[in-house]
Design a protein with these regions (language model features):
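Juxtamembrane segments of multi-pass membrane proteins
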Residues: 419-552
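Hydrophobic, glycine/alanine-rich multi-pass transmembrane helices and their short helix-loop junctions
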Residues: 257, 286-289, 345-388, 392, ...
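Extracytoplasmic
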Residues: 77, 104, 153-265, 276, ...
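Signature of alpha-helical transmembrane segments and their immediate interfacial
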Residues: 4-56, 390, 394, 398, ...
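Short helical (or helix-break) motifs at transmembrane helix termini and adjacent helical loops
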Residues: 303-324, 344, 351, 386-387, ...
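Interfacial segments of transmembrane alpha-helices in multi-pass membrane proteins
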Residues: 241-293, 360-364, 635-680, 749
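Helix-loop junctions and hydrophobic alpha-helical segments within the transmembrane domains
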Residues: 322-349, 712-735
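Membrane-proximal extracytoplasmic
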Residues: 2-255
Length: 821
């Protein structure tokens, strides 16, 4: 009988085993050369890692392919403002801001902000900038000037009184001056590149200079509040020191638990070193690829370390079991490689595919995260599957540790793993299914409450009591505007000057009035409302005339409001922006406002007038939220499809695919439910966590099923095979899950809220994925007929074949295994 008459599962298993055997022999035979090569690569990439820099960027956070962002880019030159910083000075003394101390501080603070590198100096607004002016009606006609005259002296009471009158006439109360006249605002817009250097703007440097401004004027009896993307990046970066501290704590916790688990200093050190190697290689490779690391993806190296620990523990555990059976360190290393190369590599490739799937979201920061994580996992195949067996081949286990393990093995090992065999029997499996179905029903219902976008006010990346969020609350309370603004672009065609055509202005007026009544909107500004102020002024300031005339001549009276220099429209009003200031930037608020804009545009069509979304930072958030929402289902389908494909290719069994994928699917649904319960929104920072959790969680199922399949094909029953799989692979999997659960659990005390959220979600997925593999996988195997299917493959494999690899050694039905104790 030849290979053509044997089932493909048997043929592929033989060929794969022969390939693995050849690889094991090659690695052991050339271990000195390979070890020197790995050491050289480590030194070179370690040196390269010293050149790694933090690389934040505003445009990296934006889905530039989204229709909203195409509109945003089209009018970025005419209507900038998505990347804005607000600096508010609040007088803490008696009276209001019209005193010498405060006005001097405001003047100097305006200059300080003006000269920050990267600030668009034509877009700085303050009482002391020449682009802020007032207009009044006199007996001689209109008169206007800058709010603060050029010869202003803060020590002159008459000048202070004049500025007070000018501010009242300028309409800046609630905008650049607080509603209670106790604070004043400096608003500036940033460029993405520094004009002086031509390089990407250094947001860290901008944040440091803003903090210097705060410190300088806080000494003068003034409260300084600062918000904006640059300041947020600075606060996140300042929290990175805490992130590194938590990484160090997690490392120490992992080391302590690993030593308690292995009772071996040597294997503990080897596992930690090999788990750190892909992190070092990754950090060294990024500068060579022209990449940095964004503050929002600073957690990726720890994920790589966690995955590395998981696979290193499996390898050292298999090596130790071989030593217990009497093998030499070299033979034990070869045996460990032979057993774990296939499941370990498949698990890592699955992780890498999961990270690649993240790149479906067309946002640069997410794609960089996917590239970084994928590269780190691929490097781990070399460090864990090649370098670690080489190191183990040179290592001798401590005599006391080896003797203890041999005594345990001689006593029959620990009986606790045999208890798990009950879940591989049909009757108890029904109980597992009942619990799983109940969790599925609850998770499905609860996950429907999951919101897309931010939840809560302020910056969700930081805690509610952080300085940034306190500043945000103060500015939102004191002014009618904030940093959260949505810009709607009104495009006009076929008009010489659209602002002088009543149908156009009427459509904008009706749109503005409609949006003022929308929940979540704080205030609305447009050329329509500003034009009505000037028209009333033309008529002796009579408020009854604050309306839109139906003739072009009448609208001409408001032409001062239609000046492109005001930043509200382009020449001839070909494009007009309507600014909608929102009360917050929660995902539900943004979605509701966007829906209302679309509804108005659909129900109120105006010839040659189109309402286009969107600009402003809220427009960016709207595009990002929609991109995340659109990508969620596609991402999950892609990653589960990739996992299913790899499992099908590896195990040649649809039953194996279901046994591994079904628990992962349940955990993903439960993860969404946990996010909804904890008030964590689905956004750029959290969506990758779900994918990462699935990628890491699949390791447990692959390792357990591979051993289960091996024992079944050598004559074991399903319960016995699963008990042995738990003995040989489950110990390490359980340790890894608990260790990573504790490690990321410490993130709950971080100052960075996004690290807290990621820690909670990862801890949940690490632990619950293990439960899925331990309880649901054997239950599915019991009812899917895995034992019968593998028995058929075994029988076909046992039939004689003229082509049999001479190097393959028959394995016993159940190789002795012992927990590492």
């Amino acid at each position: 009988m030849n290979d053509l008459s044997r089932p493909p599962e048997a043929v592929s298993a033989s060929r794969l085993a022969a390939f693995v055997e050849r690889c094991a022999d090659t690695i052991i035979r050339r271990r000195k050369l390979l070890m020197l090569l790995c050491v050289a690569v480590t030194l070179a990439l370690g040196l390269s890692a010293t050149r790694l820099k933090l690389d934040p960027g505003f445009n990296k956070m934006i889905p530039m392919q989204h229709p909203y962002m195409q509109v945003f880019e089209r009018y970025a030159g005419a209507f900038p403002g998505a990347n804005t910083i607000l600096v508010s000075l609040r007088w803490k003394g008696d009276g209001d801001i019209y005193n010498q101390t405060f006005m001097d501080a405001l003047r100097h603070a305006t200059d300080d902000v003006f000269f920050i590198p990267g600030v668009n100096r034509s877009r700085v607004f303050s009482l002391f900038t020449p682009n802020v002016h007032y207009t009044e009606v006199t007996e001689a006609g209109f008169r206007g000037d800058v709010v603060v005259p050029g010869q202003f002296s803060s020590s002159n009471p008459d000048d202070l009184a004049k500025v007070r009158r000018n501010v009242a006439r300028s309409g800046q109360i609630g905008r650049l001056v607080g509603n209670d006249l106790k604070s004043a605002l400096i608003r500036a817009e940033l460029r993405e590149t520094d004009p002086a250097t031509g390089k990407r703007l250094d947001y860290s440097a901008v944040a440091r200079q803003l903090e210097e401004i705060r410190a300088r004027y806080a000494k003068q009896g003034i409260d300084v509040n600062i918000i904006g993307f640059a300041k947020l990046v600075g606060d996140v970066e300042s929290g990175i020191a805490g992130v590194m501290a938590f990484f160090a704590l997690a490392f120490l916790v992992t080391a302590a638990l690993l030593f308690a688990y292995t009772r071996s200093l040597k294997t503990t050190a080897l596992a930690l070193v090999v788990a750190l190697l892909p992190v070092v290689w990754l950090l060294g490779a990024l500068p060579l690829l022209g990449l940095g690391i964004d503050p929002m993806s600073i957690l990726v190296p720890f994920l790589i370390f966690s995955i590395g620990v998981s696979h290193a523990v499996q390898m050292t555990n298999a090596w130790k079991q071989a030593l217990v059976r009497g093998a030499s360190p070299v033979d034990a290393a070869r045996d460990a490689f032979r057993k774990l190369f296939v499941p370990g590599t498949v698990a890592l490739l699955t992780n890498a595919l999961g990270f690649m799937v993240i790149m479906r979201i067309r946002i640069d920061i997410v794609r960089e995260l996917g590239i970084t994580a994928c590269l780190g996992v691929l490097l781990m195949i070399v460090t864990n599957k090649v370098f670690l067996p080489i190191l183990l081949s040179y290592t001798r286990l401590e005599r006391g540790t080896l003797a203890r393990a041999q005594r345990t093995a001689a006593a029959g090992g620990s009986g606790r793993w045999s208890r798990f065999a009950v879940f591989a029997r049909p009757a108890p499996a029904l109980g597992v299914f009942a619990v799983a179905l109940a969790l599925l029903a609850y998770g499905t219902l609860e996950s429907r409450k999951l919101e897309i976008g931010d939840i809560g006010t302020g910056a969700p990346e930081l805690r509610a009591n952080s300085r940034y969020n306190i500043d945000n609350a103060a500015i939102t309370h004191q002014y009618n505007i904030g940093v959260d603004v949505l810009s709607v672009i009104v495009e006009t065609t076929g008009f010489d000057d659209a602002c002088l055509h009543y149908p156009v202005m009427s459509a904008i007026e009706r749109f503005e009035m409609n949006m003022r009544g929308v929940a979540g909107v704080q205030s609305v500004t447009s050329v329509s409302s500003q034009g009505k102020v000037f028209i009333a002024a033309f008529n002796e300031g009579n408020p009854r005339w604050a309306a839109l005339p139906r003739s072009s001549d009448g609208l001409t009276q408001g032409s001062n409001a239609f000046d492109p220099d005001n930043g509200m429209n382009t020449a001839n009003c070909k494009a007009i922006q309507v600014l909608i200031y929102t009360k917050n930037h929660e995902g539900t608020t943004i979605a509701h406002i966007v829906d209302e804009i679309r509804r108005f545009a659909a129900e109120n069509p105006t010839p040659n007038v189109a309402f286009r979304l969107a600009g402003g930072n809220v427009g960016v958030m709207a595009a990002t939220n929609e991109a995340v929402g659109d990508a969620e289902i596609a991402m999950l389908l892609s990653i589960f499809g990739a996992i299913a494909l790899l499992c099908a290719v590896t195990f040649r069994s649809w039953r194996a695919v279901l046994c591994i994928v079904v628990p992962l699917t349940l955990v993903s649904i439960l993860c969404n439910a946990v996010m909804a319960l904890l008030g964590i929104g689905l956004k750029v920072a959290t969506l990758p966590v779900i994918t990462l959790g699935v990628g890491v969680g699949v390791d447990y199922g692959i390792y357990l099923y591979e051993r289960l399949q091996h024992d079944l094909r050598h004559g074991a029953t399903l319960p016995d095979a699963f008990a042995d799989a738990m003995r040989q692979r489950g110990t390490a999997a359980l340790f890894t899950a608990v260790t990573m659960f504790i490690g990321v659990g410490t993130w709950a005390f971080s100052a960075l809220k996004f690290q807290v959220d990621m820690g909670v979600l990862l801890a949940f997925m690490f632990l619950v994925n293990l439960f899925g593999a331990v309880f649901l996988l054997p239950a599915l195997a019991a009812w899917l007929g895995v034992e019968r299917a593998e028995r058929r493959v075994q029988q076909a494999h046992a039939q004689p074949s003229p082509v049999a690899p001479a190097t393959l050694k028959p394995s016993p039905a159940l190789e002795p295994g012992n927990p590492v104790r």
